[in-house]
Design a protein with these regions (language model features):
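Extracellular/luminal Protease-associated
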Residues: 1-3
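Phosphate-binding loop of NTP-binding sites
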Residues: 17, 23-170, 229-232, 258
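Short, structured beta-strand-loop surface elements
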Residues: 11-17
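Acidic, Mg2+-coordinating active-site environments of NTP-dependent enzymes
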Residues: 5-11, 116-259
Length: 259
């Protein structure tokens, strides 16, 4: 309620008056994040962030308490609201980071402070504020500056070149369907009528699993999830069992049938 140009507030509430509400919110999230010494997965990329996040939750939540971004909360406002959910019970955090122009990733990185980084892909989404895909990719990679490990598609020439130029100190788990020397080699991908069979080699061990999808985007998202699960030492038999039960994720712009 406003009286004489002033907002009346409840006397029982506490308020902070700050010069910049967004920066204050982000600083609070940074401070809150610093309280937790747990693995945190930071996911960025032009597409697939939410699906990878939700599938990782399906794959990993049976073994640990996970805090993750709600829906597609990956913006300058969404990320601090997501990070604020961290609690003493949390054993793993999974947060998305989305940008639309140069210079935005630094603030998201300071709030998320990921220990595990996943770059899903690089495409034309939000390209209008970037001079090139390479510039966009380099900006996204700043999220991983202090990560222990970075996961990406080693067959993507643009991403591989940008990772090499970025001088990241993190261990790399680059998966590949063509290069047997990559840390995670995808030896075979076989599409059936309603599922896909994927065989892989990791740490000189060969395994196979199925996913209930046949589209290329789902296969790519699955391989990013696979790399994260392997890094977190999820047993191969559990990966096989849980991959087969992956469920589709409702996304933005989904067409709903009217009633």
């Amino acid at each position: 309620e406003v009286e004489n140009g002033e907002l009346r507030v409840e006397s029982s509430l506490n308020f902070l008056i700050v010069p910049n509400p967004l920066k204050a919110l982000q600083k609070l999230a940074e401070t809150h994040r610093d309280k937790f010494k747990i693995p945190v997965i930071g996911i960025t990329g032009s597409n697939g962030k939410t699906i990878v996040k939700e599938w990782l939750h399906q794959l990993l939540s049976p073994d640990r308490c996970i805090v993750r971004s709600p829906r597609s909360y990956n913006s300058q406002i969404g990320v601090p609201l997501s990070v604020w959910q961290l609690s003493e019970e949390a054993e793993l955090g999974i947060f998305e980071a989305g940008i639309s122009e140069m210079g935005e990733m630094g603030a998201l990185k300071r709030m998320i402070k990921p220990t595990i980084g996943i770059l899903t892909n690089i495409g034309g989404a939000h390209q209008e504020n970037f001079f090139s895909l390479q510039e966009k990719c380099m900006e996204k990679l700043t999220l991983f500056k202090d990560c222990d490990v970075v996961i990406y598609n080693g067959d993507n020439e643009l991403i591989s070149n940008c990772v090499a130029k970025s001088m990241l100190t993190a261990r790399e788990i680059a998966w590949s369907r063509t290069d047997i020397e990559r840390p995670l080699y995808i030896s075979r991908v076989t599409k059936k009528e309603d599922h896909t069979v994927i065989s892989y080699r990791y740490l000189e061990m060969d395994n196979t699993f199925c996913i209930p999808f046949i589209d290329d985007a789902s296969i790519e998202n699955t391989l990013n999830c696979l790399a994260a699960c392997l890094y977190l030492m999820t047993p191969a038999d559990q990966i096989t069992e849980r991959m087969a039960r992956l469920e589709p994720i409702a996304m933005r712009l989904e067409v709903k049938e009217g009633k």
